[in-house]
Amino acid sequence: MTKKANFYAIHGAFYYLLCSVLVILMVSGCTRDVYDPNGGGEDKPNSFDFSTTSTIQLNVKYDVPEGYKVLFNVYFEDPFTTDEGGQTVLRTDITPAITRMTDENGEYHAKEIVAADHGSDVYIYTSYVGVPGLVQTTITDNVINADIEWKLTDGIPQTRADKWDPSTEYGLLGTWQTNGRPNYLDSEGELVLSASVLKTIRNTIQEGGICPQTYRQSADFKVDDLQGRDTEVSVRFIGGNSSAASIFGYYCYKDGASVKEIKAAKKYIVFPNTHTAGYYGKPIGLKGGECVKLHYIDENGVDKGTVFPNGVRIGWFLLNNAFVKEGKTDKICYSTTALNGDGRTHTAAFRINDFVVLSFEDYTDYDYNDVQFNVWSNPIEAIAPDVPSVTPDPGTDDDRSVAYRMTYKGILAFEDNWPNKGDYDLNDVIVKYNSCLLYTSPSPRDR
């Protein structure tokens, strides 16, 4: 063998040896994946279900006339706060956890999905007239039970408040209890307010809306019976959306009296406490439909009994939140516009057939639904104020108008390997959604 041939033989053997070594190294480096998702074979229970929501049972029942459906909101924290002016207002920094509408019997029963981190306190709020505005309860074993009815706070008879003698400033029709409930209510004049009346009032002067100008007026009502009969005048309490515990009263003056004479007229208290919402422990002494019969007070401030002569006008006033402030208030609202310090008209009035509605705007939001009353006379024709007529709500199930809207927004991320094991990056498909759900007036029972 020549030297050249020997070189090539050695070179070839070395080449094959090197290749063999490389193959062995590559094979020995191909070990299996040592990741063990079970943590080394130990069985550890995984109690985290990745859920951010929970399912609860919601049972709500309002004491309402048949056919009156109530739109309500459920919060897990107090939805009210006090603004710079000292008024209790609905918060704007939170949204309801649940918004629903009852059926025609005032009931709602359904499963609801809420955030898993909800607390135990529950606040149920509605702006609908004729029912309590705010009720606080709790959630127990994932169930909310709320049987909502007019619950008057305890009161004991008294002639005057602890530190305020109203008789030094105002005329009195009688005494009242510590919760502001008059001891002179007229049971014969009490009325169960119908669903049609309540719905018509709600639709005419809506919470959070702007009261149409046509209803705003100086709502001083004139007694004028064409047959000259003895006339009695009464006021029924309807309700309202005010957070204030206001004093409501009236005054009498002759038709054509000057502003000076009207201002000097003796002011009489009718309802010492018009609060019905139950905010911040304020007392409740009235419920919708309860009535007081007025007395005619002559120009000298003398009580002449319950018969009103023709030609007398009756004006109204509201002392904002004065019942819980010993008669003091920073806002007095009169139905006689000329008496209002801000120059504004603070009353709205309209009729539903023969049912005359008087409503106050007690501050500045212009919805004019804060406190509402029904003024009526016997004979009924004796008070026929020139106020707009409103068509009563028909109260039929054909009304399919939108009661409320709920908007859902979010982002969904998908893993396309599920349920097989994979990379779990959850970025294979990403969807951003915006869904608007409309609820009509009939309550959705099956969802």
Please name every model-derived segment.
Residues T31-E232, I380-E415:
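Acidic/polar, low-complexity intrinsically disordered N-terminal segments immediately downstream
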Residues T2-S28:
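Sec-dependent bacterial lipoprotein signal peptides
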Residues V129-P157, F323-V356, V431:
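Structured interaction patches on ligand/partner-binding surfaces of diverse proteins
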Residues D103-D121, V292-V312:
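Short Pro-Gly-centered beta-turn/loop motif in secreted/extracellular proteins
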Residues Y439-D446:
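Conserved small/polar residues in nucleotide/adenosyl-binding loops
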Residues Y68-G86, S243-I269, R447:
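Extended low-complexity, serine/threonine- and proline-enriched intrinsically disordered segments
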Residues H118-G130, V312-G327, I332:
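A short, solvent-exposed beta-strand micro-motif common in secreted/extracellular proteins
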Residues E361-T364:
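Short beta-strand-plus-loop segments that form exposed binding edges in beta-rich domains
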